Amino acid sequence: MKNFVIDQNLKELTEHRTVELPVACYKTTINQNINGYIPLHWHDEIQFVLILKGIALFQINEEKIEVHEGDGLFINSGYLHMAEEKEGSDCTYICLNVSPHFVLSQELYSSYVQPYMFSTNLPYLFLAGNQQWAKNILDAVKKINQLIQQKTSLYEIDITMQLTLMWKNLVVNGFQLEYDQSEMIKSHRMKQMLNWIHLHYVEKITLEDIAKAGQLSRSECCRYFKRMLNKTPLRYVMDYRIQKSLLLLQHPESNVTEVSYQVGFNSTSYFISKFQQAMNMTPLSYKKMNS
């Protein structure tokens, strides 16, 4: 069982190889995550995904994308996203996270990378394995994964060559970039509200509190959450508290009552009820299975 680590801002704490090689590449089986899915998060790195087995359902901002075996995604820097497997397909994929500054030389970054980082109409690109330009990118993802595993002589240089090839294919087959200030503001406000929840989830939280964090009215706040997460703000708070309880329940010395209060519930019975709804088992059953 793996724990997907994010900070209170929902920023993924990606582990890079070294400062000299700011690349993380690994295989992920979605249902082996502690939550059973990859929770909502974002990161500064750009991300390439290649589905090796099964079907993944990604949500990037408010859009949902189904990705099948042999296909993949490019996910841009800074965008909120999450993933779950579809229909018990035991989905496994390669995930490649790369610092944008490492894709091309610094001299080329401002012309060929930075415009893509700041565009507002490129949260992601679907990479269809039956299109040659996309296949070139996906093959390079596999090659980089092999290079990192094998660490043959000068493998770091080989990785930079593959990244250059990937980015050229993406740029040549991309589209007209757009820059919409209102979309930037929406994304920033959503992150502000989520960050506030993650800092205060152990406290009593009202809809007004969340809306205030995003400088929105209560109705606007609800529309943001409905559009981006397809749930109400307070339902998100509930789900986040359950998510935080999973790690605590795995500690051998923890007990259900203590955990319920540590994640913001003021009633153990209510915590048990909501946990069972979310996880299809009681907190105690989960603890026995995972501690």
UniProtKB/Swiss-Prot annotation:
Domain HTH araC/xylS-type: 191-289
Alphabetized GO MF terms: DNA-binding transcription factor activity; sequence-specific DNA binding
SUPFAM superfamilies: Homeodomain-like, Regulatory protein AraC
DNA-binding region: 208-229, 256-279
One Pfam family it belongs to: AraC_binding
Keyword DNA-binding belongs to the record: yes
InterPro entries: AraC-bd, Homeodomain-like_sf, HTH-like, HTH_AraC, HTH_AraC-typ_CS, RmlC-like_jellyroll, Tscrpt_reg_AraC-type_HTH
Protein keywords: DNA-binding, Transcription, Transcription regulation
Protein's recorded name: Uncharacterized HTH-type transcriptional regulator YdeC
Source organism of this protein record: Bacillus subtilis (strain 168)
